């Protein structure tokens, strides 16, 4: 596990972009795994501004809310289109289908996509409770793409994106921890003091399902990029 501490979110995002750009230009990265939320927003803005040619790169996304259409402003389809896909050309892009009515079939469909497009670099954020994707504490390390019941803390953290608290979805489709660990390389981004405890448990704590991100200690190629605040407890 390589640890990089930077001055702020912008510097950390630029460092992540350097790694991604190197992988794409060398031809090593054909599939890029993407995350959502506030953490990767600056990375995507920097990628859009860059000269990195992504037209031969396929993208996959970690998760999507159950029940939200792709054109719903709160969906992750919409988020990705607004921040990246409408501004940068990719070969093709895949996300779970939030409107799928058969959860088991949708999870199997997405796993098939992941097997056809092995992830070369997976970008991750981390929740204050150590979740990666929507894999909440207690999730099996052997989990594949699955339908998740969102915890109160995760819904609380995400309610700022919704007009009303009751509009925050209760379920999501998420790549499982095993699905994430299948990526050849992982870049974990964390910025801000509120992520410091989760980062401490991820890097220095035991590998335990109560901190899902701690499983990254078992991955052969992980780069953790932090700002000074997120690194403050290390």
Curated annotation (Swiss-Prot):
Q: Which key words tag this protein in UniProt?
A: Carbohydrate metabolism, Hydrolase
**SUPFAM superfamilies assigned to the protein according to its UniProt record, in alphabetical order:** NagB/RpiA/CoA transferase-like
Q: Which organism is it from?
A: Listeria monocytogenes serotype 4a (strain HCC23)
Q: Which PROSITE patterns does the record match to this protein? A: GLC_GALNAC_ISOMERASE (PS01161)
The reaction(s) catalysed by this protein are: alpha-D-glucosamine 6-phosphate + H2O = beta-D-fructose 6-phosphate + NH4(+)
Its GO CC terms are: cytoplasm
Report the enzyme's class at the first EC level. hydrolase
Q: Which gene encodes it?
A: nagB
This one is known as: Glucosamine-6-phosphate deaminase
């Amino acid at each position: 596990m390589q640890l990089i501490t930077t001055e702020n979110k912008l510097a950390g995002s630029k460092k992540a972009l350097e790694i991604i750009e190197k992988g794409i230009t060398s031809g090593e990265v054909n599939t890029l795994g993407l995350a959502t939320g506030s953490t990767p927003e600056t990375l995507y803005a920097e990628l859009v501004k860059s000269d990195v040619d992504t037209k031969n790169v396929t993208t996959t996304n970690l998760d999507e809310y159950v029940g939200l259409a792709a054109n719903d402003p709160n969906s992750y389809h919409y988020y990705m289109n607004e921040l990246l896909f409408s501004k940068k050309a990719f070969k093709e892009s895949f996300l779970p289908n939030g409107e799928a009515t058969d959860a088991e079939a949708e999870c199997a469909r997405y796993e098939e996509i992941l097997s056809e497009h092995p992830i070369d670099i997976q970008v991750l954020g981390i929740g204050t409770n150590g979740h990666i994707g929507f894999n909440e504490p207690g999730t099996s390390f052997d989990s594949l793409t699955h339908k998740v019941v969102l915890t109160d803390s995760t819904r609380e953290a995400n309610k700022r994106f919704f007009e009303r608290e009751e509009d925050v979805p209760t379920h999501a489709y998420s790549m499982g921890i095993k699905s994430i660990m299948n990526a050849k390389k992982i870049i974990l981004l964390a910025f801000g003091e509120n992520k410091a405890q989760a980062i401490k448990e991820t890097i220095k704590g035991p590998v335990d399902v109560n901190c899902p991100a701690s499983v990254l200690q078992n991955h052969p190629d992980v780069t953790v990029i932090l700002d000074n605040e997120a690194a403050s407890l290390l």
